[in-house]
Swiss-Prot record:
Family, per entry: Belongs to the frataxin family.
Annotated gene: cyaY
NCBIfam families with a match to the protein in the record: FeS_CyaY
Listed GO MF terms: ferric iron binding; ferrous iron binding
Protein known as: Iron-sulfur cluster assembly protein CyaY
Entries under Gene3D superfamilies matching the protein: Frataxin/CyaY
Function: Involved in iron-sulfur (Fe-S) cluster assembly. May act as a regulator of Fe-S biogenesis.
Annotated Gene Ontology cellular component terms: cytosol
Lineage, uppermost ranks: Bacteria, Pseudomonadati, Pseudomonadota, Gammaproteobacteria, Pseudomonadales
Top-rank lineage group of the source organism: Bacteria
InterPro entries: CyaY, Frataxin/CyaY, Frataxin/CyaY_sf, Frataxin_CS
GO process annotations (BP): iron-sulfur cluster assembly
Length: 110
């Protein structure tokens, strides 16, 4: 069963807020902007992560210099799962943030 439009937006909003909170509390040198449902995280080395919602597909998209990734929400696990690799969003973010910022952050709740 696919997500309703309202449920999808609630999930993306909650995920983006959780990401903002986590990055705020991390102590990393970065800038964040959330505009029109697009969350951009800019690291001090110039790399960035861009999270956007794709309403027609009910997907959360992540753009990084290593590529674009599309995540579907799995109601059973309560996690965003990459449609291609089946990697959890939190796992991917832990790896990407380590590669971009050299810091280990815990994204288990994402």
């Amino acid at each position: 069963m696919s997500l309703s439009e309202a449920r999808f937006h609630d999930l993306v909003d909650a995920t983006q807020q959780a990401l903002e909170d986590l990055f705020d509390e991390s102590g990393l040198d970065l800038d964040m902007e959330n505009s029109a449902g697009v969350l951009t995280i800019k690291f001090d080395n110039g790399s960035q992560l861009i999270f956007s919602r794709q309403e027609p597909l009910r997907q959360l998209w992540l753009a990084d210099r290593s590529g674009g990734f599309h995540f579907d929400y799995d109601e059973e696990s309560g996690k965003w799962v990459c449609e291609k690799s089946e990697e959890l969003l939190g796992e991917m973010l832990e790896r990407i943030v380590w590669e971009r910022a050299g810091e280990k952050l815990d994204f288990d709740e994402i």
